[in-house]
Amino acid sequence: MFRQRDILSVMNKLIVSWQRFVLICGLTAGIVSCATLPISELPSHNFGHRVKFLVMHFTAIDYQKSVNALVDEGGLSAHYLIPESNDPSYPNSSLEILKLVDENKRAWHAGNSVWQGRTELNDSSIGIEIVNVPECHRDKQAGKGIQTEHGENRLCVFPDYDPKQIELLIALSKDILARNPDISPTRVIGHADIAPTRKNDPGPRFPWYELYQEGIGAWYDNDTFEQYWQRFNQYQPNIGLVQTALRTYGYDILETGILDEQTHNVVSAFQMHFLPWQVTGQVDSKTAGAVFALLDKYFANKAKSLMTRYIAEQSSDASSSSALEYAFKRGQIDQVFPMVERS
């Protein structure tokens, strides 16, 4: 019995000692955590903001499927989701913006993307998903190897955007731009602009010009556009120059001098944004005029440099044509024989 009491006494003492130890540690930690570190603020002028781009998307699926895709673990995401009126899967009577990811955090909406020399735009952008469901099909006879977003092998019917959606989008975008000064007009872009080989959203029905009128995003001045168009009708810039102009504005395109697949995709994305009434993927005087009108407005020095090249190439081509004509005429024979009709 004596031994049992001794054992109990020792155990009680150990328990009390442990409780005191825990209490002392807790108090010590509280004192340390509450103490003010010797930190003084000395603001530097040398810093930047994380957010530099605002990217517009359409979901291509209804509201409920969009929520599942953007919210459930393991999927994609965006910072905001704007539902659509008359969507049977939307449970509320009035539209409201859903905030899915805090703006200070990275959302998974841009994927493999490039704009104005920056890559992986998830790191530096805010993404807005808008519920809008186009109907797209691929040509079954074209083969599995052809999987481009633009071209004859793909058919898409794009519906108009809900006006109530656009009202919410304009209000949200203005609020975002007011808080993120690094998002310049040319940095308000669509998913197709930053990933033209694999995306076509927000599509040619997206009201870019309406947003521009509200102070959101870029657009050309009509008079400037018309002047470039008239000039390029007389002498169209070569494909290499247009490729460089598109790259200067922000698109991920290399100058190859030929109308290759990358050029077709980039030109299609550009036309959906700035010439939505003619999405052909072809380089013509209107497309070139729109690109140069945008550069003239937002990157004037670069536009001037490209026009210097344009004039030099025009003069060079004119000289080459004159030399070729002279080469044909300088001999005694200036006709091609045999002639179809002999005199």
Regions inferred by a protein language model and the residue ranges of each:
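C-terminal motif of bacterial Sec signal peptides marking the signal peptidase cleavage site
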Residues: 32-33
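Active-site-adjacent loop/helix surface patches within enzyme catalytic domains
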Residues: 36-182, 186
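Second-shell loop/turn segments in exported
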Residues: 67-68, 114-117, 152-164, 196-198, ...
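Short acidic, glycine/serine/threonine-rich helix-capping segments at coil-helix boundaries
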Residues: 232-304
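Extracellular LysM carbohydrate-binding repeats and other cell-envelope/extracellular binding modules
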Residues: 276-342
